[in-house]
């Protein structure tokens, strides 16, 4: 019984957290080219964020699908990915950037949350982790685990 209750609490806590509408509009992140960008540049359209790590095999297996989805110009939401160098056992920024540049993805926007600000505000418990922000960049939905392209589209609609 205790195990079931613990599992239920772990599953439901991120969902209830998202109802607080935490704003992420003021967060600045780094690009792979060390440029600073603000999430506010994505205002005006819902924003889907895939939180992931280089050590996560499930995350890596889903990158090709995210690459395809990111290249779809007919979506009614934006798609980005965020890694957090130096957080949750992720390698540091220079190592992560060097590693990622060895991959062959053309469409994925990868931003770096070096201070773990999004991890803290969105209560990211593990990877992969999915976030949906409304057009004003308020956190409205979270979902742990892998989502394929069709599931992401459904996640962004609900």
Language model segments and positions:
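Hydrophobic beta-strand anchors of alpha/beta hydrolase catalytic cores
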Residues: 48-49, 79, 130
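Short pre-active-site segment immediately N-terminal to redox-active cysteine/selenocysteine motifs
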Residues: 45-47, 52-55, 126
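Conserved redox-active cysteine motifs that mediate thiol-disulfide chemistry
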Residues: 51-65
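Structural microenvironment flanking redox-active thiols in thiol-disulfide oxidoreductases
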Residues: 61-102, 114-120
């Amino acid at each position: 019984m205790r195990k079931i209750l613990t599992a239920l609490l772990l599953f439901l806590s991120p969902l209830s957290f998202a109802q607080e509408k935490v704003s992420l509009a003021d967060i600045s992140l780094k690009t792979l080219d060390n440029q600073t960008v603000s999430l506010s540049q994505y205002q005006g359209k819902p924003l889907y964020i895939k939180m992931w790590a280089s050590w996560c095999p499930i995350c890596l297996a889903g990158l090709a699908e995210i690459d395809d989805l990111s290249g779809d110009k007919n979506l009614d939401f934006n798609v980005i990915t965020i890694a957090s160098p130096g957080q949750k056992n992720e390698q540091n920024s220079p190592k992560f950037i060097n590693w990622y540049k060895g991959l062959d993805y053309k469409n994925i926007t990868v931003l770096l949350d070096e201070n773990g600000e999004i991890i803290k505000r969105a209560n990211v418990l593990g990877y992969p982790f999915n976030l949906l922000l409304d057009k004003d960049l308020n956190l409205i939905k979270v979902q742990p685990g892998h989502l394929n392209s069709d599931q992401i589209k459904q996640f962004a609609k609900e």
